[in-house]
Amino acid sequence: MSEAWSPAPENTLESLRHGIVNTDGIEFDIRMTSDNQLVIHHDAEVSISPERINDRSKWVDEWSLDELKEEGFCSLDDLLNDSEVIEHWREKGKMVCLEFKRPHRFSPKGRRLLKNSESVNSMAKTMKLTESKLDEYEIPQQNSVFYSFFKNMKRPVLTSQIKRNWAELMPNIPTFGSRTFKRLVAYPQYLITPISRLIKRHRTAGAAMIPCAIEYFTPLYGRALIGKRVGFRDKQIKFLSSQQKGMPIYAWPARPDYEYRVLSAGLTGLTDN
């Protein structure tokens, strides 16, 4: 009898390979290391136990790529050098969403990015390096999208002359604070941004798609929104389509119990399951 399958740790080559092989695509987070390399890592702090950090900095951007790889984390180069990943990404048309993370405001690097122009330049540098690597491996432009919780995402896109698809994640969330704090900051923005305004903002900016919180389609949160509601009923889907005008919407997090309704509404679901 075969052993029960267990998922590989997050942000490892094994887990990313499994995702792109067995689904329509994957999403991961990109950060710049201390030696200006690209690592796939979600949190601003290195995701290992305090005992393993010892007396080193806890911030990802203070570690070199080799140090992070020694702890099992995957670089963008590692991913692109994997033949199975490349086959599915480049040859089989799988979609990859790359979320760009800024340094934490309290990290040494984050404290140096006090001016908005400095943050824009830092984001532009990370995005340009990423695009050059994807171009090197001939990843089709339609098979990738760049996005970030970065206000006025269009600025680093123009600064770095990015040619790939991009979008801005909204509401805008600070790099610091607990999960609860970030939600408290985000919800007021969310409540005053109906789906029609969200779509218009992305279309006007020139974004290629619309990342959208699943809360827009749930009854509880939908009722609290200012403006016309959307959901999974026929009339609500028709209204949504009239606003989209063909522009794709990626809804997140699309839990398994929402999957059928998300797909039936003509949306793309992003999930961490």
Predicted features by range, described:
Residues M1-N273:
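Phosphate-group recognition and catalysis centered on beta-loop-alpha active-site segments
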